[in-house]
Regions:
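Residue-level marker for buried hydrophobic side chains located in beta-strands
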Residues: 1-3, 43-44, 118, 156
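Histidine-centered catalytic micro-motifs
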Residues: 118-125, 155-163
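Short acidic, glycine-rich surface-loop motifs adjacent to enzyme active sites
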Residues: 2-11, 110-130
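Extracellular low-complexity, Gly/Ser/Thr-rich intrinsically disordered linkers
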Residues: 84-85, 120-124, 268-308
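Active-site glycine-centered loops adjacent to acidic/histidine catalytic or metal-binding residues
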Residues: 5-6, 46-47, 121, 158-159
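Extended active-site neighborhood of metal-dependent phosphoesterases/phosphodiesterases
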Residues: 15-112, 116, 134-137, 142, ...
Length: 319
């Protein structure tokens, strides 16, 4: 089982003076299902895990590094599963140079792995309420060049509690400067951000695309810039890509049902599919020497929420 972070909810901000005690109770709840006693679990540090050391008391991480540590919980780590190298990044430390160094070390130690997968918490190519935040897109533009330079195949993320899958992407880069304060003020106007009502899955857009207000114009220009239209790689044939140069980014929905966020009203160009119906989901990954396949299901009826998606590499057949 791979988790992209936020095994718990409580933080110092939400529970001043009580976060350590309350988060410990939440970790106990997370680990309580009997099935977890017989399954290996690989977790990633999320922002809710990162402000006290309780996370480190529950998860033994192999091949741990001091690189990527935020000084409270541990740094990056890696493991191999079959022919796949999983590199788990603690991006609560935003020092991209450390994550780059860690990935280079992990790859050098495992040169024969066919597939390279990165897991981190923030949805750097997601499609719900956090995905357009400058804090998130800035992290995108610092990390992605290192992912591409190290031939990463797939990046798994969380944070936004809504499912999304991108096109294959390569070469996205920052073109507009925009601050978190500017963004937050406009987001409050635009989509009533926050945990969504059970009856609403996509937030309505309150700011008109033809607004002439300077703040609105700057906001819409920023949103257009982070669509990364030019990064979309034209290698897709149906729900299969063959020998791509770029990377697939997938953001997980909530698997527990404890919290959901709305999809943003203006779906980003880089998104191939997205889904939010306030139902927990889980994804199953199947890997062979030549294929990497993802299926994602609802927990209430085990129906798929997206088509089967497969990456093929090292093959020449015409599909």
């Amino acid at each position: 089982v791979v988790s992209a972070g936020d095994q718990i909810q409580t933080t110092k901000k939400k529970s001043p003076g009580k976060s350590e005690m309350t988060s410990e109770i939440e970790y106990t709840g997370y680990l309580s299902p009997d099935v977890l006693k017989s399954l290996p679990v690989a977790t990633t540090v999320g922002n809710h895990d990162a402000d006290n050391a309780n996370y480190t008391y529950h998860f033994n991480t192999p091949n741990s590094s001091d690189l990527g540590s935020n000084g409270v919980v541990g740094g990056d780590y890696y493991f191999t599963y079959g022919n796949t190298l999983f590199m788990m990044l603690n991006t609560q430390d935003t020092n991209a140079a450390e994550h780059k160094q860690f990935m280079e070390q992990a790859i050098a130690a495992n040169p024969n792995c066919t597939w390279r997968v990165v897991t981190l918490h923030q949805d750097i190519y997601g499609s719900a309420e956090h995905s357009n935040e400058p804090e998130i897109t800035n992290l995108r533009y610092t990390l992605v060049p290192y992912f591409e330079a190290n031939d990463v195949d797939v990046v798994l993320t969380g944070h936004d509690h809504a499912y999304s899958r991108t096109h294959i992407l390569e070469g996205g880069h920052k073109t507009v400067e925009y601050t978190d304060d500017e963004f937050d003020a406009e987001l409050d106007k635009d989509m009533d951000a926050g945990e969504n009502p059970a009856t609403r899955y996509e937030a309505p857009a309150n700011i008109s695309t033809d607004s002439k207000e300077p703040a609105d114009v700057a906001y819409l220009n920023y949103l257009n810039a982070v669509m990364d239209k030019d990064a979309i790689e034209d290698t897709e044939k149906g729900e299969t890509v063959v020998n791509p140069d770029g990377i697939l980014y997938m953001t997980a929905n909530s698997s527990s049902g404890s919290k959901y966020y709305d999809l943003v009203p203006r779906m980003q160009s880089y998104i191939a599919n997205r889904w939010q119906e306030d139902v927990p989901t889980y994804s199953v990954i199947d890997v062979t020497d030549n294929t990497f396949t993802i299926n994602t299901y609802r927990t209430d009826n085990d129906q798929k929420i997206d088509e089967t998606f497969t990456i093929k590499k090292g093959v020449t057949e015409d599909i």
